[in-house]
Amino acid sequence: MAGTLYIVATPIGNLEDMPPRVAATFGAADFIAAEDTRVTMKLLNFLGLKKPMVSYYEHALQKGEGILRRIETGENCALCSDAGMPCVSDPGEVIVRDALARGIKVVPVPAASACVTALAVSGQDTSRWVFEGFLPVNRKQKKERLAELLGEKRTVIFYEAPHKLRTTLDDLTAAFGEDRSITLCRELTKLHEEIWKTTLGEAVAHYAANEPRGEYVLVM
């Protein structure tokens, strides 16, 4: 009898936000499929658990095949990303797609999501929204994606890394104008958490003089 693939959310920053069901699922799993085994090892140490792990981040198609074969032989797998809900802007989505196609039972074990957490505290319209995840790395492709969003009336949510924030703010300003409202949510649930609602023009000016630090969720 085949096992089960559990899609397990982990805290987005503060380990005290760990739901009991998440810890129990890790404890009951035969093995863990992790985005980065080093990050997940810290989580397991916090929980006092030892489990065999495999990383799925690189070559998700090939790694996924091995993971799914183990589940088909009866093992239960807990799949997690470094933080938040896996398989959203994450290569784990390929594994879930293939698991469903092969008739493997997939069970969500939800917890915090940086996207929804940022939206809730953004002060922007939360009635209708769209999640864009990370914008393309290629500058031309990024500008094309932003051009597609020019007519978007829903609140738009992006993820961004600190080393790319300045360029992204410049591109957003060029596309939407410096008066466009934006909320920058930095290091959510962590020690240096910051939620700043401002305009694109003010954000560009601020980060021209200040180094971006930490992971960002942009809500505009």
Show the residue positions of the predicted features.
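Conserved helicase motor
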Residues: 54-62, 134-139
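Class I SAM-dependent methyltransferase SAM-binding "motif I" and its flanking Rossmann-like core
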Residues: 94-152
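Glycine-rich, flexible N-terminal cofactor/catalytic loop recognition
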Residues: 1-58
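Short glycine-rich anion-binding loops that position phosphate/pyrophosphate groups of nucleotides
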Residues: 12-15, 82-86, 162-164, 188
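Short active-site oxyanion
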Residues: 26-32, 103-107, 155-156
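Glycine/small-residue-rich loop that forms an oxyanion/phosphate-binding "nest" at active or ligand-binding sites
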Residues: 64-113
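A contiguous loop/helix-start segment that scaffolds small-molecule binding in enzyme catalytic cores
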Residues: 2, 155, 159-220
